[in-house]
Amino acid sequence: MDGFKNLEIKNFRGIEHLKIDDLSRVNVFLGQNSSGKSSILECLLLIMGMSNPDLPMNVNAVRARNFSNFADLGYMFPNYHLSIKPEISSEMLDDTRRLLALEMTYVFDEKSAAEQQNGQIPTSETKTFLNTLKLAFEIESQGKKNTFESSISINQAGLVSSKKMAEGYLEKNSAAFLPADLAAGNPANDLVELTKRKKKDMVVERLKHFDPRINAVEILNNVAYVGMDGIDQLLAVNMMGDGLRRYLNIVAASANPTNNIILIDEIDNGLHYSAYKKLWEAIFALAADTNKQVFVTTHSKETLYRLNEMLEEHSEYQDALRLYTIENTKLKGHQAYKLTYNGLHEACENNIELRGIVL
């Protein structure tokens, strides 16, 4: 399995420092509102795609569609202090180490400068502004460290003027991010890949657990459709409710063998509680079958109880679980409090609150 052993975050959004150790195949993050759960998933995505200069803006767009401009990248910096570099580091399961640092800076652009001065009277004033986001990253393996840099720049009008890809680096891993916003998900790419590999039946089999009438899934014009017993035509998933759409998005991404890492924000969104246990079983089974690592956030107590029930019935998955309560403590800042299956089981049996610890 390719993936993460640990993750360390410094100065990213509201997280000054957070270290998460002993990551496993399926990792669930709990916590109160604004504890940093979603930020953890964003950091995992960024460090997996650290050579992609478009990724930071895409991450912001997923979080809030109205904050997808270059200027909004400042929200990734602590308290909008652009002089403090966010850093994300990790040790991977293949014993390589990764480090990514984000930096806002000014890079002189001859073309933009010429356009700005065209037809104007030259002055001695230097007009500069932060126009470039640099993604400086390192890969260390067997004592050898390699450094790379990607960047994206804008002109005076705020439009992207240049992008620089890291030379000599090719990312071998792929992460799929499933946001809390139900409207943002589309399983088309995953289903197309599964169709090419003749593995689409894996998804149909799991969809039958959600609704036993489902007998097919198809992609037409980038839209997902399902076939159902007793109905003569395919039905658009988007017209069948949030529950099926959410379930299909997660199952298709989990089944796609090209995705090494699955990131699911607020897994319970759009789903009726009766589907939770079936979905947990699908996630663990597909992660094992396709050898991938999964990261999930939730604030639903019912979701945790159904997870416990599923693991009671499927003991083969118990060792694969890690549960982390993320807490911004008064004395120690952000902390990750870890539990394994035994801790989850005990908490559910004794009605112990896991989603937030007041310290």
Predicted regions and their residues:
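Pre-Walker A-like glycine/lysine-rich segment at the N-terminus of P-loop NTPase domains
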Residues: M1-G49, N60-R65
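Phosphate-coordinating catalytic segments in nucleotide- and nucleic-acid-processing enzymes
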Residues: M50-P257, I261, R322, E327-L359
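Loop/turn-to-beta-strand initiation segments
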Residues: T258-N260, N291-F295
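Walker B catalytic acidic pair
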Residues: D265-I267
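Conserved hydrophobic alpha-helix in the ABC-type ATPase nucleotide-binding domain
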Residues: L279-I283
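H-loop/switch region of ABC-family ATPase nucleotide-binding domains
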Residues: T297-H299
